Amino acid sequence: MKKFLTIVACFATLTLQAQLQFNLGKGSPLQKMQVAEMAIKNLYVDSVNENKLVEDAIKGMLEQLDPHSSYSSAKETKAMNESLQGSFEGIGVQFNIVKDTLLIIQTIVNGPSEKVGIMAGDRIVSVNDSAISGVKMSREDIVRRLRGPKGTLVKVGVVRPGIKDVLTFRIKRDKIPIETVDAYYLIRPGVAYIRIGSFGATTYEEFMQALMKLQVKGATDLILDLQDNGGGYLQAAVSIVNEFLQRNDLIVYTQGRNTSRQEFRAHGNGGMLTGKVFVLINEYSASAAEIVTGAIQDQDRGIVVGRRSFGKGLVQRPIEFADGSMMRLTIAHYYTPSGRCIQKPYVKGDNANYEKDLDNRFKKGEFYSADSIHLNDSLKYQTLRRKRTVYGGGGIMPDYFVPLDSTQFTHYHRQLAAKS
């Protein structure tokens, strides 16, 4: 009897393998993975969560690629989309999960977190005295702990670059409206100031409304503030750049191993074709913000002021699954008009060093001194009209360097802000 059961089990395994080899081809990596999944499902001694097995397998594959290819569950996907559309009740931050830690990309202007002094680059390590860092907590669980009804309090522990002790903040949750143009006004007669916090579904319309109102008041020149702008929708960025460039000027192009070169060019019908333009950036300006900055710099349409931007220039295609979950897969790189790749270097599968890049820049003094930035001659490029030297190698290098203001938040200010 025992021998008979062994033969039956072996036959069942062989049947699974034969079926998949017929459908997928003998020796195919996909066949190997599906044989393993089917074997676990049908032969494993205990019950298993098949959905979790598949999700973990997808995450494992993506971890071996670039730092920005990612998978999100249906609930996580919905939560991420809310940061660009609609409104919600919470603490008012946009964040990524970086090596099991919540890294704040930016705070919502006038939102609960900004009001108490939380900043881009902070890492939230605990919520209401419960650790959320280093415990492999899902994004969904973290979001659930941070969000809550308007008016309720939440206590968070924050690790900030350059500060040894964990900072404690008490935040009163509030309704978070999503307006991506944070501020606009005449900074002096004839000079407009517009700050864009992120590039969402309504950013272009918000920007145009602000620009036209300021032009009616006499604005001819513009300061465009993209500091701490973590990016967003490509089309919003392209539409805004179109307002500054002449007809057929190249804005950005993409190219990948399996994708042909795709160019985005200006139509020449913009509302800001003349007048001086200054773009403000810092180390947290990324993705769509870098596309805008790189186009204006390379086309000699304006001057870039600040510090080297983040360096996120990967084109990601969202691949939606039937259950509402999503995989964002990198398919190409973004290049500025002069040919500079916006993406900073990375080693596939080595996210740990990639995630330390900003910390390393800080330690090397790059945030405080332009002399701390060393670039090879091979990274030199030329702007398209005036043939000025600009640099590649990841991120956008400003034309004029402005050091980080180390006096922005004193120890006393942090203590007061943490206590609301």
Report residues per predicted region.
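Structural motif
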Residues: 121-123
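Hydrophobic beta-strand signal
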Residues: 125-126, 303, 328, 343, ...
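An acidic helix/loop motif centered on a single conserved Asp/Glu
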Residues: 48-65
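Extended catalytic-interface subdomain
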Residues: 317, 329-347
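PDZ/PDZ-like peptide-tail recognition elements
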Residues: 56, 68-106
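Conserved functional hotspot residues or short segments at active or partner-binding sites
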Residues: 341-420
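Bacterial Sec-dependent N-terminal signal peptides
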Residues: 1-26
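Cleft-lining beta-strand/loop regions that shape enzyme active-site pockets
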Residues: 18-29, 33, 37-50, 73, ...
